[in-house]
C-alpha cells in the first residue's frame, strides 16, 4: 500500500513530477472527498476607469501585483498590463496604452498606493517592480512580500519559478500544464482572451501563496532571515541593476580587431601542424585530427556518442605530447574572449540608458552566492593579458567617478 500523504510532498520537494503521476495516480485509488472543486476567478478591466481600481486598492490592506512587459525592457518601456488582486480569486487590471507618456500618466495615478508604508505588496519578483517604478519617479515603500525570495529562504536547493511554487503549495499547475495532471482548476471569464486569463491566473496564484509561505517562514523560524537579510538585499541589488554599467564600445571594437588577427594567425599555425584544414571548433573533426591522424594518444577512447572527447580537461593533460595542443587551447581562449565578451557585450547595452543592466540573482545558489546574468559580469577574465584588456573596457558612467 502507498501512503499518498507521505510520498506526495517528498516527490514534489525533489521535483519528481513524473513519479507523482505514474506512481501516485496509477497505483492507488484517489480520495475523491479531498478533491478541490473548480473555482471561479473574476477578472475586471479597469482600463477606462482607473479610479474605481484605485479606490479598491486604497481600501485594501494588502494586494498582489503582477506586471506584464511585452515590448522593450524595464529601462526603455512601460508595462502593458498592471494586474492587481485584493481578494481571493478576484483580479483587476489596467491595460496601459502604447503611448509612453499616456502610460506614465496612468502609472502615476497609483503612486500613493505604491508609496503607502501601511500596505502589503505581494509580488512574484519585486526587484523588477522596484526598478520600473523608480524610472517612473515612484519609490516603492509598501511592506513587501516577495514569493521568489520567501521560497528561496525555505527551499534554497530547488527552483523558485512561480509555476513550481504553485504546484508545491497550492497543488495547482499554471496554464500550459497537461490537463490530466491538474488538481485544481480555475475558471475564467469566457469573453476574456487566453492571454488575459493567463495574467489573471498568475495574479491570483501570487495572492494565494502569500499566506502559505508566510506561515511556513514562521513555523520554520526563518522569518528573521527573510526580513532582516534577504529582503533588504533586494533593494540594494535593484539599485545596482538600475544604475547599470558603462562600457567603452570603441575600446571593445579595437580589442575585437586584435583578437581576430591573433585567431587568424593561430588558426593557420594549427592547420600547418595538422597538415590539413578542418573546423577547429568541431569536437568531432578535432578529435579525428588529434587521435586518428596525429596519433597523439593511442589509449584515448571514444565516448558513448562515438567521438573523442576534446574537452579542456583532456587537452591540458596532453600539452606536452604535441605542440598543436597549446595552439588549440590558445585558439579556444581567444575565441571565447571574442564571442563572449568583445563582440557580445555591446549587444547588452540598453537603448534607453546606454548602459548594461545585468540581472543579479540572489535566489540561485543554495550557498547564498549571487549570480549575474545577461550578461554575466562576475566572470570577466583577468588571468591573461587579453582578459585584462576586456576589463579596461568597463568605464565610469560619469567623469566625476573613478574605478578603484
Predicted region positions:
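Conserved "right-hand" nucleotidyltransferase catalytic core of DNA-directed polymerases
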Residues: 1-97, 121, 157, 185-195, ...
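Amphipathic coiled-coil/heptad-repeat helices and related helical stalk/stem segments
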Residues: 49-50, 103-107, 126, 386
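Short acidic, S/G/P-rich loop/turn micro-motifs used as interaction or catalytic elements
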Residues: 71, 99-101, 130
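Charged catalytic and DNA/RNA-contacting regions of genome-maintenance
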Residues: 78, 85-90, 105-216
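A generic local secondary-structure boundary/capping motif
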Residues: 110-111, 391-393
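An acidic, glycine-/histidine-flanked metal-binding catalytic module
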Residues: 404
